[in-house]
Amino acid sequence: VHWSAEEKQLITGLWGKVNVAECGAEALARLLIVYPWTQRFFASFGNLSSPAAVLANPMVRAHGKKVLTSFGDAVKNMDNIKNTFAQLSELHCDKLHVDPENFRLLGDILIIVLAAHFSKDFTPDCQAAAQKLVRVVAHALARKYH
């Protein structure tokens, strides 16, 4: 994947403003609420019986932060995303058996969360760069499945 200097600047500039705990918790909660079938991968998280329960669940918040912290690794390693996510791809494929489509869904939700939090900075050019990044990350996470 080729990244232009402008794309890199837009992504790193936006990412520098992201609160990974807050945005990560919101993104994962939205995934579990909007696509409830994804909850089956989080059975150990306890009560996910309603949107309010998902939003209040401390394990959802903690894992959302973990997910977005890992996503930050993609921002730091934009020229080597495939290798950055090699171990996570193996984990999600071989041990957790996560449907790789879920990576795309989470990426789309992350775009919504970023747009909601950073509306002034989230220009069409920024959105295009961010969308490209979430697609590349989703592809890297799904790599072990191919």
Curated annotation (Swiss-Prot):
<feature type="binding site" description="distal binding residue">
    <location>
        <position position="63"/>
    </location>
    <ligand>
        <name>heme b</name>
    </ligand>
</feature>
<comment type="subunit">
    <text>Heterotetramer of two alpha chains and two beta chains.</text>
</comment>
<dbReference type="GO" id="GO:0020037">
    <property type="term" value="F:heme binding"/>
</dbReference>
<dbReference type="GO" id="GO:0005833">
    <property type="term" value="C:hemoglobin complex"/>
</dbReference>
<keyword id="KW-0408">Iron</keyword>
<dbReference type="GO" id="GO:0031720">
    <property type="term" value="F:haptoglobin binding"/>
</dbReference>
<comment type="function">
    <text>Involved in oxygen transport from the lung to the various peripheral tissues.</text>
</comment>
<dbReference type="InterPro" id="IPR002337">
    <property type="entry name" value="Hemoglobin_b"/>
</dbReference>
<dbReference type="InterPro" id="IPR000971">
    <property type="entry name" value="Globin"/>
</dbReference>
<keyword id="KW-0813">Transport</keyword>
<dbReference type="GO" id="GO:0043177">
    <property type="term" value="F:organic acid binding"/>
</dbReference>
<feature type="domain" description="Globin">
    <location>
        <begin position="2"/>
        <end position="146"/>
    </location>
</feature>
<dbReference type="InterPro" id="IPR050056">
    <property type="entry name" value="Hemoglobin_oxygen_transport"/>
</dbReference>
<dbReference type="GO" id="GO:0042744">
    <property type="term" value="P:hydrogen peroxide catabolic process"/>
</dbReference>
<dbReference type="GO" id="GO:0004601">
    <property type="term" value="F:peroxidase activity"/>
</dbReference>
<feature type="binding site" description="proximal binding residue">
    <location>
        <position position="92"/>
    </location>
    <ligand>
        <name>heme b</name>
    </ligand>
</feature>
<dbReference type="Pfam" id="PF00042">
    <property type="entry name" value="Globin"/>
</dbReference>
<keyword id="KW-0561">Oxygen transport</keyword>
<dbReference type="GO" id="GO:0072562">
    <property type="term" value="C:blood microparticle"/>
</dbReference>
<keyword id="KW-0479">Metal-binding</keyword>
<protein>
    <recommendedName>
        <fullName>Hemoglobin subunit beta</fullName>
    </recommendedName>
</protein>
<dbReference type="GO" id="GO:0019825">
    <property type="term" value="F:oxygen binding"/>
</dbReference>
<dbReference type="InterPro" id="IPR009050">
    <property type="entry name" value="Globin-like_sf"/>
</dbReference>
<dbReference type="GO" id="GO:0005344">
    <property type="term" value="F:oxygen carrier activity"/>
</dbReference>
<keyword id="KW-0349">Heme</keyword>
<dbReference type="InterPro" id="IPR012292">
    <property type="entry name" value="Globin/Proto"/>
</dbReference>
<dbReference type="GO" id="GO:0031838">
    <property type="term" value="C:haptoglobin-hemoglobin complex"/>
</dbReference>
<dbReference type="GO" id="GO:0046872">
    <property type="term" value="F:metal ion binding"/>
</dbReference>
<comment type="similarity">
    <text>Belongs to the globin family.</text>
</comment>
